Amino acid sequence: MTTKLERLIDQGVGRIPADIVLKGGSFFDLVTGEIVRSDIAIGADRIVGTSGDYRGETEIDISGRTVVPGFIDTHLHIESSLVTPHEFDRCVLPYGVTTAICDPHEIANVLGTEGIEFFLESALETIMDIRVQLSSCVPATHLETAGADLPIERLLPFRDHPKVIGLAEFMNFPGVIHKDSVCMAKLDAFQGGHIDGHAPLLSGNDLNGYLSAGIRTEHECTSAAEALEKIRKGMHILVREGSVSKDLAALIPIITERLSPYLALCTDDRNPLDIAEQGHLDHMIRTAMASGVEPLAIYRAASISAARAFGLRDRGLVAPGWRADLVVLDSLQSCRAEMVFSAGRRVSDALFATRKPVAPIGLDSVKARPVNAAHFGVPVAEGETSVIGVMPGKIITEHRRYRLPAKGNETTVDLTNDIIKVAVIERHGKNGNHANGFVQGFGLKKGAIASTVGHDSHNICVVGVNEDDMAYAANRLGEIKGGFVVVEDGKITGEIALPVAGLMSIEPYETVRDTLHHLRQAALALGATLHEPFLQLAFLPLPVIPHLKISDRGMVDVDKFALIG
């Protein structure tokens, strides 16, 4: 009886036909930078031959096409696609993303270990290779109320799961630097494994201390200077381009052939509408090359460099013995996937149909107390008021200060300066907390927008001009079991239900995509000026990203890591 290994060797030598042979095309050699005209032979889940003439049980003509290794998204939260892992697989794999390294941080903050188990079970069924990093900071800080708590004792049972790739983004960098005991326990347990970083603007000796904990990758760089310091200190930089956080343009200067071994690509948070309109990592690759980046540099970052950064030694090259994750492109410059292979399987609707479904969880996670307009009042204060300053395309916000108008004994919105109200309402049934503040930069002239997607604890976050509309929008989220709601003059003008932990839809991604298009139009009707108002809203409660945020406990000065007043 011939073993699988013996069969692969025979196919590579050419003694027997390969399972699949891609004929007539070329491949991009990411070692030499050459375009090599060659057949590509596939046996089972791996490449068995290149630079030769092969016979195959199935032969596919790819004349005029160029093959590259499958793309690797090195850091993302699948929940931000607003669909389940199965639908994410079906949505993104056709764009050439054959490996996704995800942090189920969002669902873990709502449901704890049940959320991690859901992702691991899903990862065993998807066609795309989904790898899971264990969420390191649940809750992210003591400055908010999460639905769950994940001490090291609850993470350790998952550490050796075949789909687990290490410890996810360690956001509590002050806790690392100051040797917080909870942080130390988690870091100590994963020494020798992969620990993902999250340290925006951290520099100098503080960065040295953070890296001394064994942290090796970083996706929060927003400038070339920041990225270069971190590369010099041994980090791999994951260049990010999501629906909100758009750092690619700022990091173009570092995407060079010399630095490409220390670079990878990631999306972090990207919704189905943007994926449908622009693409996924393929969009990043096209954009980079249009900005003057050499193809060798960006394609390395998209595959082999990413694989090496995370210890995935079996993928990232078109070469014999390597995993057959392949993308057949019309050309390198256009980066349009015409055909995708995942572990030797040609991606198709029929292949997706073979997956075992995984039942949704967390369908009753929204337990917020009802609110009314009075809950959104802000008492008049002497002097200036702290205002969250939104920066389009960034999740970093500014700490701005304004003298705001008053009506009676309450501070009101200032539409002339684009300042409206923002509130966060605890929705896990823990304490009923409710905090109010002000935000600048949404462009709203009327109405309200509310969401149960609110990083990282995913309480209800609502922005608005009218307190009655804010209350209506917040209460409606409980009725639909989570999601996004747009209210204008007492009427719901757009909504999407996200009943899986208040984060993900149970509908196909096409339905979510189309509904998001309508939601954008509803937000624009309120005056919204942001490209992605819903995900921008979702980052207002994130107290680990500078400089000013809001949680269910109040306004947070992130630089001081403390509540304001």
UniProtKB/Swiss-Prot annotation:
Q: What is the lineage of its organism?
A: Bacteria, Pseudomonadati, Pseudomonadota, Alphaproteobacteria, Hyphomicrobiales
For this UniProt record, the keywords arranged alphabetically read as follows:
Hydrolase, Manganese
One biological process term from GO is: adenine catabolic process
- Name of the protein in its database record: Adenine deaminase 1
Report any Pfam family annotated for this entry.
Adenine_deam_C
* Reaction catalyzed: adenine + H2O + H(+) = hypoxanthine + NH4(+)
Keyword Manganese in the entry? The reply is yes
Name the family the entry cites: Belongs to the metallo-dependent hydrolases superfamily. Adenine deaminase family.
- List its EC numbers: 3.5.4.2
NCBIfam families (alphabetical): ade
Needed cofactors, names only, are: Mn(2+)
Single Gene Ontology MF annotation: adenine deaminase activity
